[in-house]
Amino acid sequence: MSIDIETARRVAHLARIRVDEADLPALAGELSGILTFMEQLNEVDVEGIEPMTSVTPMRLKRRQDVVTDGDMQDKVLSNAPDAREGFFAVPKVVE
């Protein structure tokens, strides 16, 4: 598929990018190259091929889902300019 200069201008406008008039032919050529490559990918027979997310099989390491308090309340609140009863104290913003 070939992209003309007017289509390249429209794509740039829709993408909200400014492209100088002198650069439009190069942009049209690059977009045409991308679409040509996509057309080549569409010709590949992938029937029966299982999709993959990585070339090496990986498994996520799992850990127990245990609820804790984090043992960091004092540490975190020590950075607060104002803390009361274990919470951050902030100025009232709604009357």
From Swiss-Prot:
Keyword terms: ATP-binding, Ligase, Nucleotide-binding, Protein biosynthesis
GO biological process: glutaminyl-tRNAGln biosynthesis via transamidation; regulation of translational fidelity; translation
This enzyme's EC code(s): 6.3.5.-
Gene3D superfamilies: Glu-tRNAGln amidotransferase C subunit, N-terminal domain
Catalytic activity: L-glutamyl-tRNA(Gln) + L-glutamine + ATP + H2O = L-glutaminyl-tRNA(Gln) + L-glutamate + ADP + phosphate + H(+); L-aspartyl-tRNA(Asn) + L-glutamine + ATP + H2O = L-asparaginyl-tRNA(Asn) + L-glutamate + ADP + phosphate + 2 H(+)
Domain of life: Bacteria
Presence of the UniProt keyword Nucleotide-binding in the record: yes
Any GO molecular function: glutaminyl-tRNA synthase (glutamine-hydrolyzing) activity
Entry function: Allows the formation of correctly charged Asn-tRNA(Asn) or Gln-tRNA(Gln) through the transamidation of misacylated Asp-tRNA(Asn) or Glu-tRNA(Gln) in organisms which lack either or both of asparaginyl-tRNA or glutaminyl-tRNA synthetases. The reaction takes place in the presence of glutamine and ATP through an activated phospho-Asp-tRNA(Asn) or phospho-Glu-tRNA(Gln).
Family, similarity comment: Belongs to the GatC family.
Subunit structure: Heterotrimer of A, B and C subunits.
Protein name: Aspartyl/glutamyl-tRNA(Asn/Gln) amidotransferase subunit C
Organism of this sequence: Cereibacter sphaeroides (strain ATCC 17023 / DSM 158 / JCM 6121 / CCUG 31486 / LMG 2827 / NBRC 12203 / NCIMB 8253 / ATH 2.4.1.) (Rhodobacter sphaeroides)
